[in-house]
Amino acid sequence: MDKLRIKGGKSLAGSVDISGAKNAALPELCAALLTAETVTLQNVPGLQDVATMLKLIRNMGVEAERSAHAPGTVILNAGPLSSPEAPYELVKTMRASVLALGPLLARFGEATVSLPGGCAIGSRPVDQHIKGLQAMGADIIVEHGYMLARLPKGQTRLKGAAITTDMVTVTGTENFLMAATLAEGETILENAAQEPEIGDLAEMLIKMGAKIEGHGSRRIRIQGVERLHGCTHQVVADRIETGTFLCAVAAAGGDVVLNHGRADHLEVVIEKLREAGATVTAGEGFIRIQASGRMKAQSFRTTEYPGFPTDMQAQFMALNAIAQGTSTVTETIFENRFMHVNEMVRLGAKIQIEGKVCVINGVEQLSGATVMATDLRASASLVIAGLVASGETFVERIYHLDRGYDQMEAKLRGIGADIERMKA
């Protein structure tokens, strides 16, 4: 098992190429299941979750190859698909596997998808996926840890429906969006998620021949078509990777350009960084951040897009930990999203948890120690903390990091960080 060694105290300078978004690439790989024609995806990040999704759809019989000539390009053909099943062995490490449910049901009329590992119906919105697809005419039962979905006897297509979810669900919106493209009639999604990755998925589906309006709003309208065709599509840049590097530079100090970064997808985070004291400028296909000295602590509350993203909460907390002043961070999206706090405290941070709120008293200096990553974004926050801590910091269990960041330590090293991957 690998770990990272970080020697803190170096400012950052240069440029970083932002990779394609994991949270767009995963549903877009599943969207290839909707057609028998070839789909080419460009700017696909080299992540563990992407590798798992490729393994999952290959297991179904999909031909999926990374191009030898074009890095980041994946060529997919679901024509020879033989088994509309997502087994537990391949699903247990990745919740996004539920995204195969809608496309399989829409194109093949059946799907058997394992419940994601550790997922209790009700605590995560898997029940919303089931309700929505049932509204479109699917018969779905949950037994032995699997969702078994079928079209009723004599029915060859899902039926368009009005679907209103009980809460905003990103993967639910994506599942219904994909399923509705091949449904009979019109589907209207109310209370839809507005994340840029959903807009990117919709743009890909439109290239495939889907009829979609309203993506990027709370109400999406889809007119079903009989078949979709292949397409070539470039995965949108990863706004969370972008935000992570912005926080790293704000914390460590420096002057860095993030190529392919989309400021319009990170407006709330960028505004907070400016209020903290960083200079952030942006243009077509880049964001530049300049920072020096201690930032000013910023309070925030996570909400659905376009609010402050829960996936940026831990990274910004690392910045607040060494900022001037006291801040509060309120987490409204997920439970158990403060698992990084105890590890940051080991580095010298002064943070108290009060229910869904963290109170952070900024300190002048963190000190290096051995810490353990507990999840994807927590691991990124510990890397940021390590960049500013005195002495050496070792971050263990970085397989979490590899799930969502494409060569993070190499990119940081390229802008001046003293960081290396080691065998634990």
From Swiss-Prot:
Its EC number is 2.5.1.7. Keywords: Cell cycle, Cell division, Cell shape, Cell wall biogenesis/degradation, Cytoplasm, Peptidoglycan synthesis, Pyruvate, Transferase. Phosphoenolpyruvate binds at K22, N23. This is UDP-N-acetylglucosamine 1-carboxyvinyltransferase. The active site is at C119. Pathway: Cell wall biogenesis; peptidoglycan biosynthesis. Disulfide bonds: none annotated. Cell wall formation. Adds enolpyruvyl to UDP-N-acetylglucosamine. It catalyses: phosphoenolpyruvate + UDP-N-acetyl-alpha-D-glucosamine = UDP-N-acetyl-3-O-(1-carboxyvinyl)-alpha-D-glucosamine + phosphate. It comes from Polaromonas naphthalenivorans (strain CJ2). One of its GO terms (cellular component) is cytoplasm. The modification 2-(S-cysteinyl)pyruvic acid O-phosphothioketal is found at C119. UDP-N-acetyl-alpha-D-glucosamine binds at R95, R124, P125, V126, D127, Q128, D311, I333. Belongs to the EPSP synthase family. MurA subfamily. It comes from the Bacteria. GO terms for biological process: cell division; cell wall organization; peptidoglycan biosynthetic process; regulation of cell shape; UDP-N-acetylgalactosamine biosynthetic process. One of its GO terms (molecular function) is UDP-N-acetylglucosamine 1-carboxyvinyltransferase activity. The gene is murA. InterPro entries: Enolpyruvate_Tfrase_dom (IPR001986), Enolpyruvate_Tfrase_sf (IPR036968), MurA_subfamily (IPR050068), RNA3'P_cycl/enolpyr_Trfase_a/b (IPR013792), UDP_GlcNAc_COvinyl_MurA (IPR005750). It is found in: Cytoplasm. The lineage of its organism: Bacteria, Pseudomonadati, Pseudomonadota, Betaproteobacteria, Burkholderiales. CDD domains: UdpNAET.
